[in-house]
Amino acid sequence: MYLDQIKTELLEAQDVLQKFIADENNIKLIQQAALLISDSFKQGGKVLSCGNGGSHCDAMHFAEELTGRYRENRPGYPAIAISDVSHLSCVSNDFGYDYVFSRYVEAVGKPGDVLFGLSTSGNSKNVLNAIQAAKQKDMKVIAMTGKDGGEMAGLADVEIRVPHFRYADRIQEIHIKVIHILMMLIEFEMAKDV
């Protein structure tokens, strides 16, 4: 009944992943992002993560595996997904949804911390505002984007971009794979100093 559609979906996902892997710069950027986060942790910093919709779920997933665990038993790492419902509803109501992440960064971000912002289009105004707030706090910024990077292109210290122009879910599939690789590399890097 749907066997052809299922196979087509899987093959398209495979194609997007193969194209991402074929660009050696993507591999280097993933390593750079993992080292940037690890260096922040080693200096007493933390990661704040944010995104909208599925990217919000990815931001929460990333923070959860830092504070909890990925594959190895180890100390928790300091990470916060900007996902507190009372904060989001307060700022949305009082200032507007464009400021839900930047207000949080302004409140708790410190020099040497890392903002991990996700936007498949690269145009999410609230993530862009968070990047600006992070820069003002002398934080490092890692952006995970898609398509042509949108307005976020060139704003981050490290931008990992999935140049897929059709559906956001394909971009998110690569984002979650990259998040899992980042977790693995961060655990490797942090274990060096134990």
Swiss-Prot record:
PROSITE patterns: SIS
Localization (cell): Cytoplasm
Cofactor dependence: Zn(2+)
Domain of life: Bacteria
Domain SIS: residue ranges: 37-194
GO cellular component: cytoplasm
SUPFAM superfamilies linked to this entry: SIS domain
Binding site for substrate: 52-54, 65, 93-94, 119-121, 124, 172
Catalytic activity: 2 D-sedoheptulose 7-phosphate = D-glycero-alpha-D-manno-heptose 7-phosphate + D-glycero-beta-D-manno-heptose 7-phosphate
InterPro entries reported for this sequence: GmhA/DiaA, Phosphoheptose_Isoase, SIS_dom, SIS_dom_sf, SIS_GmhA/DiaA_subfam
UniProt: Zn(2+) binding residues: 61, 65, 172, 180
Keywords: Carbohydrate metabolism, Cytoplasm, Isomerase, Metal-binding, Zinc
The protein's annotated pathway: Carbohydrate biosynthesis; D-glycero-D-manno-heptose 7-phosphate biosynthesis; D-glycero-alpha-D-manno-heptose 7-phosphate and D-glycero-beta-D-manno-heptose 7-phosphate from sedoheptulose 7-phosphate: step 1/1
CDD domains according to UniProt: SIS_GmhA
Molecular function terms, GO-annotated: carbohydrate derivative binding; D-sedoheptulose 7-phosphate isomerase activity; zinc ion binding
Enzyme class, first EC level, given as a word: isomerase
EC code: 5.3.1.28
Pfam family, one: SIS_2
Family as reported in the entry's similarity comment: Belongs to the SIS family. GmhA subfamily.
Function: Catalyzes the isomerization of sedoheptulose 7-phosphate in D-glycero-D-manno-heptose 7-phosphate.
Quaternary structure note: Homotetramer.
Other observations noted: The reaction produces a racemic mixture of D-glycero-alpha-D-manno-heptose 7-phosphate and D-glycero-beta-D-manno-heptose 7-phosphate.
Protein name according to UniProt: Phosphoheptose isomerase
